[in-house]
Regions:
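Conserved catalytic-loop aspartate of Hanks-type protein kinases
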Residues: 84
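Conserved activation segment of eukaryotic-like protein kinases, specifically the C-terminal portion
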Residues: 61-73
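Conserved C-terminal C-lobe helix
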Residues: 128-138
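Structural helix C-cap motif within protein kinase domains
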Residues: 97-100
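Catalytic-loop of the protein kinase fold
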Residues: 18, 22-35
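Activation segment signature within eukaryotic-like protein kinase domains
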Residues: 6-7
Length: 138
């Protein structure tokens, strides 16, 4: 339930940015602050250093982002604002099980796994996760 509330706020904030033609390009837990001092925590997205304005009909090609959270399209230098949605999916995966879906000992290994798009939700860390949350991840 907490993960759903957090993801809903992140999606709302990113939608706000996208409606104003701003793409973040480096969404990750380290760039999301949460106010825990109140009953209903609020998030704030920070570090817009790699953000950019965009046009709906144009693709971007500059490679920005953090390997664990980067969309495969960014690695191919051909992406749009939806790269932020990929990153939110990775953040959701981490909120649910505690670790990233694409792992590796080196940056190159992580990027290879992101490119392959292979991840697992069948191990014991996912036993207590609802089927609807698993469906959303897939």
């Amino acid at each position: 339930d907490d993960a759903a509330k957090i993801i809903k706020q992140i999606l709302s904030a990113v939608s706000y940015c996208h409606q104003r033609n701003i793409v973040h390009r480096d969404l990750k837990p380290e760039n999301i602050l949460m106010n825990k001092d109140i009953k209903d925590p609020k998030i704030t997205i920070i570090d817009f250093g790699t953000s950019s304005s965009f046009r709906k009909d144009e693709r971007m090609s500059q490679k920005f982002g953090t390997p664990y959270y980067i969309a495969p399209e960014v690695l191919q230098n051909n992406y749009d604002e939806k790269c932020d949605i990929w990153s939110i999916g990775v953040i959701m995966y981490i909120l649910l099980c505690g670790y990233p879906p694409f792992n590796g000992a080196t940056e190159e290994e992580i990027i290879a796994r992101v490119t392959e798009g292979t991840y697992c939700i069948d191990d014991e860390d996912w036993e207590d996760i609802s089927d609807s949350a698993k469906d959303l991840i897939q």
